[in-house]
C-alpha cells in the first residue's frame, strides 16, 4: 500500500479538534490530584491518627497498579453504585448521563494524587532544615511554618517533577480510547479505519503529542523562573 502523505494532514485536522478534551483529561487530574496530595501530606506531617495508614495504602495501591486498571475500575465500578444511590434517594437520574470522560478524569485524578503525594513529600525532604528552625525561632507555629516556608519551597523544588508528570499524563490520556473517549489517539484510530491508513494517522498523532509536549516543557521553564522568587520561603 502506497504511503499517503496528504492523509497525515487531513487526519491531523480531525485530531486537532480533540486537543481540548485531551488537555482537559490531562490537566484536571493534575489539579484534583494536587488537592488530594495536599490532604495526604497534611495527614502525614501532622500524623492524623487513623488516616496515616489509609494514606499510605492509597499511595501504595495507585502507584503500584497501572492507570488503565484505574480507569476500568472506575468506569465499571462507579455507574452501578451511582445508580443505586440515585434509586435509593429517588434522584431520578442515571449514570448513563455522566460523560465517559468524567470517569477517566476521576480515575486519573486518583492516580495523580498518589504520584503527587510522593513528589511533594520528596520536595519537603529535600529542604534545608535550617529554614524551618529559623521560622520557629521568630515565633511561627508549625502550621504557619508549613504554609509559609515548607510548602512553597517544596513546590518550587518539585516543579520539574510536576512537568514530567503532566507530560506523562498527556500521553496517558491515549488509553482513554479503551472506553471509547475520542481523544487524540482514539480519533486517529477512527479516521484511519476508513482506508486503513493507520501508519499515517499515528504519525499525525505523534506530531501533535510532540508539539504539545514541547509547549509543556517551555511552560516548565517559565514556571521555574517565576518560582525563583520563593527562594528562601515567604517569611
From Swiss-Prot:
Chain segments annotated as transmembrane: 23-43, 59-78, 100-120, 165-185, 196-216
Record carries keyword Oxidoreductase: no
UniProt-listed InterPro entries: AA_ABC_transptr_permease_3TM, ArtM/GltK/GlnP/TcyL/YhdX-like, MetI-like, MetI-like_sf
Pfam name, any one: BPD_transp_1
One Gene Ontology term from the biological process aspect of the record: amino acid transport
Transport recorded as keyword: yes
Compartments it resides in: Cell membrane
Chief site of localization: membrane
Membrane-topology descriptor: Multi-pass membrane protein
Gene3D superfamilies, per the entry: MetI-like (1.10.3720.10)
Record's keyword terms, sorted: Amino-acid transport, Cell membrane, Membrane, Transmembrane, Transmembrane helix, Transport
GO cellular component: ATP-binding cassette (ABC) transporter complex; plasma membrane
GO function terms (MF aspect): transmembrane transporter activity
UniProt induction comment: More strongly expressed in the presence of methionine than in the presence of sulfate.
Domain ABC transmembrane type-1: 15-220
Chain's role: Part of the ABC transporter complex TcyJKLMN involved in L-cystine import. Probably responsible for the translocation of the substrate across the membrane. Is also involved in cystathionine, djenkolate, and S-methylcysteine transport.
Family to which the UniProt record says this protein belongs: Belongs to the binding-protein-dependent transport system permease family.
UniProt xrefs under PANTHER family: L-CYSTINE TRANSPORT SYSTEM PERMEASE PROTEIN TCYM, MEMBRANE COMPONENT OF AMINO ACID ABC TRANSPORTER
Assembly and interaction partners: The complex is composed of two ATP-binding proteins (TcyN), two transmembrane proteins (TcyL and TcyM) and two solute-binding proteins (TcyJ and TcyK).
Name of the featured protein: L-cystine transport system permease protein TcyM
Naturally occurring in which organism (per UniProt): Bacillus subtilis (strain 168)
Gene transcribed to yield this protein: tcyM
